[in-house]
Amino acid sequence: MCRTIATFPNTCLERAKEFKTRLGIFLHKSELSSDTGGNGKFEWASKLSKERSFSEDVLGWRESFQSLLNSKNGVAAFHAFLKTEFSEENLEFWLACEEFKKIRSATKLASRAHHIFDEYIRSEAPKEVNIDHETRELTKTNLQAATTSCFDVAQGKTRTLMEKDSYPRFLKSPAYRDLAAQASATSASGSSPAEPSHT
């Protein structure tokens, strides 16, 4: 993270530029994917509708953390931001838990539970999330009879941490504020948003 900006100003600046670039590329891809369609008037109307929908989506991210998590684009933008803070493991764990809950096979459930534990929960895990010792031990105990709810406590604590800590910083980030300003202008005028900066 950029806590020691006086000591490492270039590193923080580079991470901020990287986030802005990633978000710009992400937005450019979103615009390209919305360009497919029919000819003439219908294509223009369809594109305008998608741009308004995307603008509403972007503006909706600031309404609540749940709104951000409910948006595929929001999750992608938030993930890009978290990478600049070296804390993407929190969101990746939360997403892994959401996918885990969809597993119906008991064999796959147990196997996937151990994989998630080894990847995010155990001490010194490659992507260890910031949870307390009691939650870590409870989750370890839950693995003995893995169910779709065995990560619920750890997932809840990670979600709360992101909501109270990372999410407010995401909303205050220059990249999101620029994006929200473009989205507001698009919603107000009904015109196409400006091409995002890739610098």
From Swiss-Prot:
Intrachain disulfide bonds: none
Keywords: GTPase activation, Lipoprotein, Membrane, Palmitate, Phosphoprotein, Signal transduction inhibitor
Localization of this protein: Membrane
SUPFAM superfamilies: Regulator of G-protein signaling, RGS (SSF48097)
GO cellular component: cytoplasm; membrane
Bilayer disposition of the protein: Lipid-anchor
InterPro entries, per database record: RGS (IPR016137), RGS_sf (IPR036305), RGS_subdom1/3 (IPR024066), RGS_subdomain_2 (IPR044926)
UniProt entry tagged with the keyword Phosphoprotein: yes
Positions bearing Phosphotyrosine: 167, 176
Tissue specificity field: Predominantly found in the retina. Some expression has been found in the liver.
GO biological process: G protein-coupled receptor signaling pathway; negative regulation of signal transduction; positive regulation of GTPase activity
Every RGS domain range: 64-180
Lipid attachment in record (S-palmitoyl cysteine): 2, 12
PANTHER family in the cross-refs: REGULATOR OF G PROTEIN SIGNALING (PTHR10845), REGULATOR OF G-PROTEIN SIGNALING 16 (PTHR10845:SF187)
Protein name from the UniProt record: Regulator of G-protein signaling 16
Lineage: Eukaryota, Metazoa, Chordata, Craniata, Vertebrata
